[in-house]
């Protein structure tokens, strides 16, 4: 597959049109939201394209991104959006509205498996192998072509994967349960940022 990768500095261009359903991912220096800064945002329209935004970590001034994330009319597809949304909330100071999540969908649809990684879903649902070699990588500096391709792979398949998972959820009568889980996702992010890491429902 030929992927159209565009690297943007600081923010998306003012005149860009991405449509009403986008796939989103973020790259951080680690998983501790207070310690490990948000470095990149990747966005795809689902048409073999990836817009990779290298954020200015000295000020995090990205009004075009903020507008997209907060826009209720634009659907955002994540894979484990919990981590991405926490970093977006902490560094870009905005909620992310109108969310879908392939990891949550997979856990409800693919109850026959304990593996819900993006690599596994891409292989099983659309029969494409991707490399996760750069999953643990320094995204804080200049990006190599291999890193850019890795970042693109994290978003370009999310539309198709989500479509396939929804088919299973509908067949197994679990779609409403999925929708209810999505409603709680923003609250789960708020709990994470307030340092309530444990399952709030556990004994």
Each model region followed by its residue ranges:
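DEDD superfamily 3′-5′ metal-dependent exonuclease/proofreading module
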Residues: 1-203
């Amino acid at each position: 597959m030929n992927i159209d990768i565009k690297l943007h500095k600081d923010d998306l261009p003012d005149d860009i049109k991405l449509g009403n359903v986008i796939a989103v991912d973020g790259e951080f220096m680690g998983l501790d939201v207070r310690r490990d800064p948000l470095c990149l945002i990747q966005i795809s329209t689902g048409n073999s394209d990836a817009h990779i935004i290298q954020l200015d970590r000295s000020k995090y001034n990205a009004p075009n991104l903020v507008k997209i994330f907060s826009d209720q009319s634009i659907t955002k597809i994540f894979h484990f959006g919990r981590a991405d949304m926490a970093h977006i909330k902490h560094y870009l100071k905005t909620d992310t509205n109108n969310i879908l999540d392939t990891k949550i969908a997979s856990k409800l649809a693919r109850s026959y498996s304990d593996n819900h990684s993006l690599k596994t879903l891409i292989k099983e649902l659309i029969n494409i192998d991707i490399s996760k070699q750069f999953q643990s990588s320094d995204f804080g500096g200049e990006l190599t072509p291999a890193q850019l391709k890795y970042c693109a792979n994290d978003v370009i398949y999310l539309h198709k994967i989500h479509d396939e998972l929804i088919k299973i959820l509908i067949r197994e009568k679990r779609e409403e349960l999925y929708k209810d889980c999505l409603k709680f996702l923003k609250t789960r992010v708020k709990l994470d940022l307030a340092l309530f890491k444990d399952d709030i429902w556990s004994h």
